[in-house]
Amino acid sequence: MVDGIPTYFESRWNLGDALSDTALFERVEVVRGANGLMTGTGNPSATINMIRKHATSREFTGNVSAEYGSWNKQRYVTDLQSPLTADGNVRGRIVAGYQNNDSWLDRYNSEKMFFSGIVDADLGDTTSLSAGYEYQRIDINSPTWGGLPRWNTDGSKNSYDRSRSTAPDWTYNDKDFNKVFVTIKQRFADTWQATMNATHSEVKFDSKMMYVDAYVNKADGTLIGPYGNYGPGYDYVGGTGWNSGKRKVDAVDLFADGGYDLFGRQHNLMLGGSYSKQNNRYESSWANVFPNEIGSFYTYDGNFPETNWNPQSLAQDDTTHMKSLYAATRISLADPLHLIVGARYTNWRIDTLTYSMEQNHTTPYAGLVYDIDDNWSTYASYTSIFQPQNKLDSSGKYLSPITGNNYELGLKSDWMNSRLTTTLAVFRIEQDNVAQSTGVPIAGSNGDTAFKAMDGTVSKGVEFEINGAITDNWQMTFGATRYVAEDNEGNAVNPNLPRTTVKLFTRYRLPAMPELTVGGGVNWQNHVYSDTVTPYGTFRAEQGSYALVDLFTRYQVTKNFSVQGNLNNLFDKTYDTNIDGSIVYGEPRNVSITASYQF
């Protein structure tokens, strides 16, 4: 979500949804657990809400920074805000930046430009208006599309230099992002406020890419495709694709929230509605890659001629509509006891080139919070799950949305006016219609794998987090999660995802030298695996448990000028981020230094 408005994307086409530059946002909010009351489509894991930067200063202020790092990274950011009227009731802010970097991957280069302009205005004592425009362009040369072949035909595993890439130098992946947005807030009746958020966004992309998906013959390095036993023409070992398209989103969310009195007690109420329309239109031209075109993979270095492309044809033209009405109230049953109940009604419809699908769903929510004392509280909550998905069945149709229930029981504490908080929670998630790969390509597709819906998936676990100030000079965030997920026959679901994770980040300002701050972080995850059924037997891909250690130091040279150094993957750990039939290595050790000036 961005400013509370959700965006749903088609994972078959890489539109760069994860590439929005963080310099454009003030903060990132993470809401754990099913979130259908917020978004209309409840994801059982979490929702990330990106909050845009706004013009809040009534005087001219700004920040400029320059960063240099490994793989020829250079990055420059300017963030300026100023009053636009003498009384400061109308203010403006612009954020602009440029980044260029190579990679540990051979031939890879990325260039990014971004800009955001926003005007915030106080139209009176009770009315405010925000309006803005955002632009990003990302050009990537020699991007990877998938990974490196993991398996030899005898079941043994391959290993490669982390710099190895299958991408030829003619491949690219370019994207343009344009967004306009507006927010109006109206306060009335003392404790009440109405808010309207609206946005229009367009994303365009154009790419020519290549992938390799095959097994390696150890004798000579030749490649053998995974689908050759399906008949003539299926012996390909990869493919090239010229893909382009556009996604347009129009969305509006209108809600009011405030307090009301009932039975001598003060309560809170929120009422709202939302509408969104999203169109995804993509065109493509594909060609299969056969073993003789690559030769021995042992000597292949990305020297592959560009495809003689056929004209593009329409591959997808889908329009998704979502209409929602929602309400929630926080009822004060007693001084220490609060009941939160709510529901969201959603009408969701998708129209494709060949068929339509429509779902109506009511997402209820109920929670009970008990304040044990000034610092401790306990809670219990329930909500349902309704999550449209973009996986296709064997006939090429979308699977029905995931449905289910989410239960949670927790204990929270709050210390020193929220400077330090802790959370302990246990949860249980029940889901139906969960997509599971069949490993079989969809007939007539460009290699898309068919999925089937699986009912009776159950996940249960526990998580703990402590976040905030341990002392005036010491900040720490520590979190740990453990869960299990099984289907209705007791088999592990998505064992390629870590069941146990531990995250620690800390920073310390030296009392004897307050200009100097040092810190670091550790991310640890347990062993993961994935079984792949191949023509040569069932092969298991595994990644053992590992920890990544990062360090940083910041020195405040003057009141306005600071320098920070970052060292990522301190021990240069080699690890695999893609536990299936291909290998995708994670980022090796790298360093960067950033100089920042505030005024």
Walk through the language-model features, giving the residues of each:
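Short acidic/polar hinge/loop motifs at secondary-structure boundaries
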Residues: 5-32, 51-52
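Acidic/polar loop-and-plug regions of large Gram-negative outer-membrane beta-barrel proteins
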Residues: 99-103, 116-187, 202-247, 292-318, ...
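Membrane-embedded beta-barrel scaffold of Gram-negative outer-membrane proteins
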Residues: 185-187, 193-199, 203-209, 371, ...
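Gram-negative outer-membrane beta-barrel transporters
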Residues: 334-336, 452-533, 571-574, 594-598
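C-terminal beta-signal and adjacent terminal beta-strands/loops
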Residues: 430, 524-533, 551-599
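Outer-membrane beta-barrel translocator/receptor signature
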Residues: 9, 24-26, 37-117, 123-127, ...
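Structural signature of Gram-negative outer-membrane beta-barrels, strongest in the C-terminal barrel
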Residues: 120-122, 247-249, 265-278, 314-431, ...
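Face-selective signature of the C-terminal outer-membrane beta-barrel domain
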Residues: 180-203, 236-355
